[in-house]
Amino acid sequence: MNYNSLFDHTLLRADASVEEIKQLCDEAVKFNFFSVCVNPSYVPYVKEQLHNSSVKICTVVGFPLGQTSTKQKVYETKIAIKEGADEIDMVLNISEFKENCACVVNEIRKYKKVCKKKILKVIVETALLSENEIEKATLVVIDGGADFIKTSTGFSSRGASIKDIEIMKNVIEKNNSKLKIKASGGIKTLTFVEELIKAGAERIGSSKSVEIIKETLNKN
């Protein structure tokens, strides 16, 4: 299996340097990762670095808490796309989701309308949700018309778990949805990646992508 094309090679640290972002881009090209995932301020720079490659540019919106207004997230999304982003990883407003699911569905629809043919991933921060809430969040993301549901920001108490993915996949299958799953947060080994994919993940977000791919080379 070609694991390389499943990875969003990620660097979202607040203190990430230009040199580190350049290295991220170079690694993504070398290992043919699907995308690099960076904070919005680096999107123009990354666009320059990747202009002769097939590597996509992914950035985050409302990150990492999701506690900005819908208008702010829409504006962030418009700017990110204008500056070169191919994919938007938007953090769901968790407190709003817990209070009013219908309202959040409408928000996601607004973000997808702005994204048009660009990919929209909705981060639901599973560390803050019960299993029942993960099911509800998956339904919300399906109804909102997003392309992916994403487990985690990587900035909460935990990242992705196999159980998270299994719950999401079960809801997706029951509803005959085309929604895809991105697993992220704390993914550091090939074994864990294999388990996540088996459970239903179709994209992996990790800052350890290179180390994981080197594991596959050693395994072969």
Curated annotation (Swiss-Prot):
Reactions catalysed: 2-deoxy-D-ribose 5-phosphate = D-glyceraldehyde 3-phosphate + acetaldehyde
GO molecular function, a single term: deoxyribose-phosphate aldolase activity
Disulfide bond sites: none
SMART domains found in the cross-reference section: DeoC
Keywords: Cytoplasm, Lyase, Schiff base
Pfam families: DeoC
Localization, UniProt: Cytoplasm
CDD domains referenced in this protein's UniProt entry, alphabetically: DeoC (cd00959)
Uppermost EC category: lyase
Keyword Lyase included in the entry's annotation: yes
E.C. code: 4.1.2.4
Biological process terms in GO annotation: 2-deoxyribose 1-phosphate catabolic process; carbohydrate catabolic process; deoxyribonucleotide catabolic process
GO cellular component, one term: cytoplasm
Top-rank taxon: Bacteria
Alphabetized NCBIfam families for the sequence: deoC
Biological role: Catalyzes a reversible aldol reaction between acetaldehyde and D-glyceraldehyde 3-phosphate to generate 2-deoxy-D-ribose 5-phosphate.
Family: Belongs to the DeoC/FbaB aldolase family. DeoC type 1 subfamily.
Protein name: Deoxyribose-phosphate aldolase
Species of origin: Mycoplasmoides pirum (Mycoplasma pirum)
Gene that this sequence comes from: deoC
